[in-house]
């Protein structure tokens, strides 16, 4: 009872609160909302940072202002996760705790939509984590529902309560299990969430997980020790909720968990006794069988693991099947809900029909009663005599007819009324016979028969219409079933098509992978052929690869089209489902119409049966009709009875009138009695009313309990339906996402297949062409080799004789010739050889002449061979030296690795020192807090000084007034003296005046003494203020030193110094002004004292004169009056001055308190001076050491700059060597040795620096240990020293980084030199081979003049080729550097957490560029 009432009241209050909160902001901000707010909202929705910052720069813009819908720009930015806009708003300044109409602040919205970066930023600005919305949910609740583990971790790290409950008593763990988020459940449990926490209905997270069928979450809860045996408020356990959810897997999990708990309890109960009994027996067996058991346990565990894996697979398959079933059941549920709604509407319609039927039944009963009355009247009329009636009788009969008319219902038709009712005046006709009455009855019968026939015809028509409608309904039902079957078939076809598309996609992916492997093989083949020299084929294959890339991109576009088609198919499926729903609704509507028609048919059939029964009754009554004689006798009897009844009616009417008058009187009396009794109540009636009210209250309470129980049941049903809808939406979303990610439409897959088949066929054709070309080229190569052999034989014959020296020199210069041009020349030479075969006879004749010339012009073969051996020996030496250099470089690399490790150790030491600094020294926040406290003190001092100034001004004004009064008194004394000179008065009155004057003098003297005391007090206060100002100045200087020593920025410290100096100067000026005013007041005081002395002397003189002379009475009285007025005036001024004095005393007391506080917080001067001197000495020592270190660091920086210049010189030298493509090994070794010596020197210097740094750190630590007893100033000085050390350390780190960069550059240059050396050696080998072949060919084919020209042409072409190759290398280097730059920038942005769409697109570009480089 109370819980249900509380729930009802809570729901009402919540609804009221929602309404109030929804209405409040609309009324508040409707008038405040302007165009700039609208622009800011639009910019926030678009995420335009520049626009947002420009609008915020204007005055009066509040980003936390709510619009008509109850949300602000700040909330929109947080919900959309735009970090830059959020930064701009936070920097501008906004109330972080502002909430929207639902009570959610920006932290709630960022957690709800899973924006972890925005959430982190808000937490950095100290946004409260425990703020709850109108549903009582914190940001952790929203993060748990949004499935965002990073935001949950952030909130927990910043102190969010894991066990916070909402209005329904649900924790974040409960909501995570409801939403089926097992990972988040585990995370919350790890963070300390209560597993067995209950909501307001005493349901645990396990119960809700079982109800919503979340197996993974239930597993997580059971693993972490959730209690299975707990019961909710209704007495249900978790297995009951698992049965409601129809999830067998969860039931099995719960059973196993409960069995394990029971087993554990039983073992706990039975364990001690069994162990006590079996201990002596078990010890021997355990020692023997321990090894066997371990082996068996391992085997069993392996078998169990395999079984569990199989079970997991089966369970996953079953889960998928169950998900499909769940989807089907949910659809059925939706249909059943629709059917239930339709049944409820039909119930309401049937109720309305029942009410109408009851009304019709009542009307039919009335009509039957009226008919019975008519038949009775007809019988009485028929049995009466035929005598004539008087006028009275006729009147009576007319009255009776009217009475019967009133009894009958107005809806009865005319043919159903009797003859007496239709024509009541027939009785008055004297010559009417029974024959005419019988004719009328027959006519009425005929009319009734015609009516019955028409009713039968109507019934037949209705039956035909009903049959027609039934047939239509059946046809519609068949159509609905057929449409359902068609839609099911279409859905199945679409599912099959999606499966086929999946298969084709997998096949296409496999084909793509095969193609990629094929492409890689082709690339390798092409690279091998490029080494041989097939540049044309390379270019053709590159073009083919580009074409293939274009086709691949087209295929990816087709895949995109296929995905779009899948989406269209999904939309079609949804349309089919909607059409099915519409058809089901139409079917239900037709069924309703059919039921209505059937009910109408039943009604009309009943009416027809009733009419037939009435007709039969009429026929039976007509058979029992009476003859005319009896009828006339009956008439006479009736007339006599009517006369008697008329008399009786007259008497009754009179009595009725009397009774009416009596009743009126009684009513009046009753009303009077009621009016009297209204004021009094009987105790019996009171008790009766009490009992009735108690009964009524009990009934109402029962009704309330029933209604509350129904309300609870309905709420549960609503919650279940809501959660079912949520689950359905999630499943639909998951299905759509799976279809989008995994499925492809049929058309797209077929197009992909076709395109891939076409590309494969084209590639096959290209491969066949390439293979044919390769075969042709191999045949040509074989021919060329054969010809080469023949030529080499001829060349060997020629070389046995002589080698010319000129050709030898030309061959040495032509070392940079390429393979491709030589092959082309070989082809041309072969052609020319074919042409010149005819000229062989001529060449034989020329051979004899050439042999003669060879002896004179060419070098012998021996010298040539000796030169060759020498060159080969030098090449071997260079190779050996290169290998030695490589080994040395490897050693250097190892040394560099060691130095890197040492650098890492130094970095760790740095981090440790930083942590020590953080632990031992004050942070910026504390410094800022101290500064704020000092500023507050300064403000309070300024306020006090302002109050003192105001009091001083008031004192000046009072002094001015006193001056004026003194002058007035002087004037009055002058007048008195003149009066005394003119007239005289008696001595007695004068003595009285004297006494008064003395009293006034005393009072004035007392006032003057009090003012003097006040002025002395003020002087002392001024001195104190001076001392306080001096102390403040000293504190300001100490603070300035602290600011300089700490990590505060220099600019801020300078600004603070300037501001404080200004304030100090202002205070000094104020003090100077006060001192000047004080000196003026002193002078004025002295003047007043002199004036007072003069006045006293004058008064004494006047007294002496008065003693000698008499004064008149009139003058004395005037003097009395004037003196009394002056005395009253002076008293009022004294009161005012006393008030001012009290105020000043209060201010002085406040200042004293301030001074005492400052004294308590401050240090005495002696100690301060001692500490200061000690610190100054230490600072001097440390500064001297720092200067030495700075000089050393400057020397090191100079050395580093020298090294950098040397490295640049080496780079330039290397570039020159690259242009020449020849490296002097001796210079290289010299530079290498120099660099090694420099590196060793730098390493030694680094070691020295590290030692010095460690020594400095030790010195600092010693100083810290000595000065731990000192106060804050000592620590501040230490901090300044360590800051300077840090600066030097940063410089050292910079120098180390420059050294490492130099080392890296040296390594890179060495690698480049090695690669170039290798290339040079390869080129030299190729050139030597080609040289030999060229020499032979030139001797064979060309005459004496032609070889020089051809060789020059060859050299030119080779140089061009070398230049083109160099350009290509430079272009590739540029591309590589650009790629590296892009890669670094995007990696940095990704590391910082800025993974926006632009960054993702850039990363895709990087991958594509990388693939392009690989290609």
Swiss-Prot record:
One of its GO terms (cellular component) is cytosol. ANK repeats lie at residues 69-98, 102-131, 135-164, 168-197, 201-230, 617-646. Its main location: nucleus. SUPFAM superfamilies: Ankyrin repeat. There is a cross-link at residue 1034 (Glycyl lysine isopeptide (Lys-Gly) (interchain with G-Cter in SUMO2)). Keywords: ANK repeat, Coiled coil, Cytoplasm, Cytoskeleton, Isopeptide bond, Nucleus, Repeat, Ubl conjugation. Induction: Up-regulated in stimulated thyroids. Down-regulated by forskolin and TSH. Up-regulated by EGF. Residues 1186-1205 are annotated as: Disordered. It comes from the Eukaryota. Residues 288-376, 759-1381 form a coiled coil. One of its GO terms (molecular function) is actin binding. It is found in: Nucleus; Cytoplasm; Cytoplasm, Cytoskeleton. GO terms for biological process: intrinsic apoptotic signaling pathway in response to DNA damage; intrinsic apoptotic signaling pathway in response to oxidative stress; negative regulation of inflammatory response; negative regulation of non-canonical NF-kappaB signal transduction. Residues 1186-1201 have a biased composition (Basic and acidic residues). Highly expressed in adrenal, testis, kidney and large intestine. Regulates APAF1 expression and plays an important role in the regulation of stress-induced apoptosis. Promotes apoptosis by regulating three pathways, apoptosome up-regulation, LGALS3/galectin-3 down-regulation and NF-kappa-B inactivation. Regulates the redistribution of APAF1 into the nucleus after proapoptotic stress. Down-regulates the expression of LGALS3 by inhibiting NFKB1. PANTHER family: ANKYCORBIN, UVEAL AUTOANTIGEN WITH COILED-COIL DOMAINS AND ANKYRIN REPEATS. Component of the apoptosome complex, composed of APAF1, pro-caspase-9 and UACA. In the complex, it probably interacts directly with APAF1. Interacts with LGALS3, ARF6 and ACTB. Interacts with RAB39A. This is Uveal autoantigen with coiled-coil domains and ankyrin repeats. It comes from Canis lupus familiaris (Dog).
